[in-house]
Amino acid sequence: MNIRPLHDRIVVRRVEEEQKTAGGILLPGSAQEKPSQGEILAVGNGQIRENGEVRALDVKVGDKVLFGQYAGQTVKVNGEELLIMKESDVLGVLEG
């Protein structure tokens, strides 16, 4: 099963972050925060404006993005946990 987001929504796979603290302490799973960055897997066709025009999204498939800790809705697709969120939930695109 694949998922195709509608309108201004995007599908994001969380990117796992380091599981150690800066001091080298290994964190157990229960103490780890969910990562707030990920890779965009799919994008909708754009935001529908009040006049009916569709504005293309600024993000694209493959972009690495930052988002808020509670952004989006978690879904399972083919056993993989993904996030569906609006483009406006994205705080920024990681470059370089």
UniProtKB/Swiss-Prot annotation:
GO molecular function terms noted in the UniProt entry: ATP binding; metal ion binding; protein folding chaperone; protein-folding chaperone binding; unfolded protein binding
Subunit: Heptamer of 7 subunits arranged in a ring. Interacts with the chaperonin GroEL.
Keywords, ordered alphabetically: Chaperone, Cytoplasm
Example GO biological process: chaperone cofactor-dependent protein refolding
Signal peptide location: none
Family: Belongs to the GroES chaperonin family.
Gene3D superfamilies associated with the record: GroES chaperonin
SUPFAM superfamilies per the UniProt record, alphabetical: GroES-like
Taxonomic superkingdom: Bacteria
Protein name (Swiss-Prot/TrEMBL): Co-chaperonin GroES
Protein source organism: Psychrobacter sp. (strain PRwf-1)
Localization terms from the record: Cytoplasm
GO CC terms in record: cytoplasm
Known function: Together with the chaperonin GroEL, plays an essential role in assisting protein folding. The GroEL-GroES system forms a nano-cage that allows encapsulation of the non-native substrate proteins and provides a physical environment optimized to promote and accelerate protein folding. GroES binds to the apical surface of the GroEL ring, thereby capping the opening of the GroEL channel.
